[in-house]
Amino acid sequence: MEMTDFELTSNSQSNLAIPTNFKSTLPPRKRAKTKEEKEQRRIERILRNRRAAHQSREKKRLHLQYLERKCSLLENLLNSVNLEKLADHEDALTCSHDAFVASLDEYRDFQSTRGASLDTRASSHSSSDTFTPSPLNCTMEPATLSPKSMRDSASDQETSWELQMFKTENVPESTTLPAVDNNNLFDAVASPLADPLCDDIAGNSLPFDNSIDLDNWRNPEAQSGLNSFELNDFFITS
C-alpha cells in the first residue's frame, strides 16, 4: 500500500535531529520603500556627487599650482642661463671689438707708412729724372739761331743746278751704247761690270741730261719722256 506525501514528511521530520542553535527567526521580507526613504537616498546621492566634484576640482587646482611653480622655476633657470650667455657674448664682443680696433689701427699705420714711402720714392724719381743743365758757358751766335731766308735757299738751288749742268757738259759726245748681240744678251746682262759704260755710270757721268728729274711728275720734260716710251722697246723681236 502506498504512503502519502504527508506521511513521508512526518516520518522524515521525526527522524531528523534539529540543532539547538538553529536560527528560528528568519530575516524580514523586502518591503516597499517609503517617500521619506527615497528623499533621503536622493539627498545622500547629491552630497556624494558634490563631494566627488569638489575633490576633483581640488586635485586639479593642486596640479595647476604645481605646474605653475615648475614653470616659474624653469623660467628663472632659463633667464639665469641666458644672462650668463649674454655676459659671455658681451665679453666675446668686447674682445673682438678690441681686436678689430687694434687691427684697424695697424692697417692705418701701414697705409700711412706705405704712402710716405711711395711719396719719397716718387720724389726721388722726379729729382733723378729732372734735367740739370751743365755749368759750362755755351755761347751761340745769333746767325745760327736765325732761320735761313728764302734767298739763301734759292741761291743754294741755283748752285746745285749749275753743278748738275757742268757734269752733263763734261760727258764726251762720242760715248755710245755698245751693240749687244741677241745671242749674247744674257752674257751682257750677267756681267755689267766688264762694260766701260758701267764705270761711267758709277762716276756720275750719264749719257743723258741728269738735270731732268724723272721722279717729279710735275716736270713736263719728265712726263714727255715717260710718254715717249713704248712697251715694244723693252721686248726683242726675233
From Swiss-Prot:
It comes from Saccharomyces cerevisiae (strain ATCC 204508 / S288c) (Baker's yeast). It is found in: Nucleus. It comes from the Eukaryota. This is Transcriptional activator HAC1. Homodimer. One of its GO terms (biological process) is negative regulation of transcription by RNA polymerase II. The keyword DNA-binding applies. Keywords: Activator, DNA-binding, Nucleus, Transcription, Transcription regulation, Unfolded protein response. GO terms for molecular function: DNA binding; DNA-binding transcription factor activity, RNA polymerase II-specific. InterPro entries: bZIP (IPR004827), bZIP_sf (IPR046347), Hac1/HY5 (IPR044280). One of its GO terms (cellular component) is nucleus. Residues 39-102 form the bZIP domain.
